[in-house]
Amino acid sequence: MAVGKNKGLSKGGKKGVKKKIVDPFTRKDWYDVKAPSMFATRQIGKTLVNRTQGTKIASEGLKYRVFEVSLADLQNDNDAERSFRKFRLIAEDVQGRNVLTNFHGMDLTTDKLRSMVKKWQTLIEANVDVKTTDGYLLRVFCIGFTNKDQMSQRKTCYAQHTQVRAIRKKMVEIITRDVTSSDLKEVVNKLLPDSIAKDIEKACQGIYPLHDVYIRKVKVLKKPRFELSKLLELHGDGKGGSDEPGARVDRPEGYEPPVQETV
């Protein structure tokens, strides 16, 4: 019989004993996700992250997370015109338990896009790269469909190639004009009611009647250097201290404060 050490007994544990299961949620913390001040609903949800441990800082794990929220939830409005628009918000900074986000893009839901595509009409799309006044480079996509004239007896409403080109040119002109003259906050305020698409629909009536004109997607291609003061201003927290002026104290001429013996 071979004489030797029993490795299982020497470690002080029984063979086959299960390891104690620790709930991973006990090591995590909840943070509130805050939307910028352009939206009616500021508190859009909560997010989880592992607690700060050693060199791993919790706030660094939260930065650059992207949250996709329906416009109906952001505006606290169940209007059908808002429910199919999705806004992407990116976490840029953490203040206490609040995650401050900024605009990162916009999109339409897939079911809305598919419901608009029908037979007997022409689909017209355009996209353009434009820069805002505060240095954001955006790629804006627009979509529209030809509309049948009320007086027409024809089943179809196809636009000619020259008309499609003219409409696409008009789309690019209006998007460029509206975005280049605005900063990011003003652009988002224009996207909320989709005023750019309404301007395009109105301007193209002379070329060919359109309907279902929407800004289909907005991508943020480039951003300026991050500045915390601008982000706080976007969230309405950028003001300094109190605006009240200090009270004036009258002192006699030649007044000197008393010398303190101990400090």
UniProtKB/Swiss-Prot annotation:
Bias (Basic and acidic residues): 236-254
InterPro entries in the record: Ribosomal_eS1 (IPR001593), Ribosomal_eS1_euk (IPR027500)
Alphabetized GO MF terms: structural constituent of ribosome
Superkingdom of the source species: Eukaryota
Region span, Disordered: 236-263
Claim: Chloroplast is one of the keywords in the record: no
Disulfide bonds: none
Any one GO cellular component localisation term in the record: cytosolic small ribosomal subunit
Record PANTHER family: 40S RIBOSOMAL PROTEIN S3A
The family this protein is said to belong to: Belongs to the eukaryotic ribosomal protein eS1 family.
Subunit structure: Component of the small ribosomal subunit. Mature ribosomes consist of a small (40S) and a large (60S) subunit. The 40S subunit contains about 33 different proteins and 1 molecule of RNA (18S). The 60S subunit contains about 49 different proteins and 3 molecules of RNA (28S, 5.8S and 5S).
Protein known as: Small ribosomal subunit protein eS1
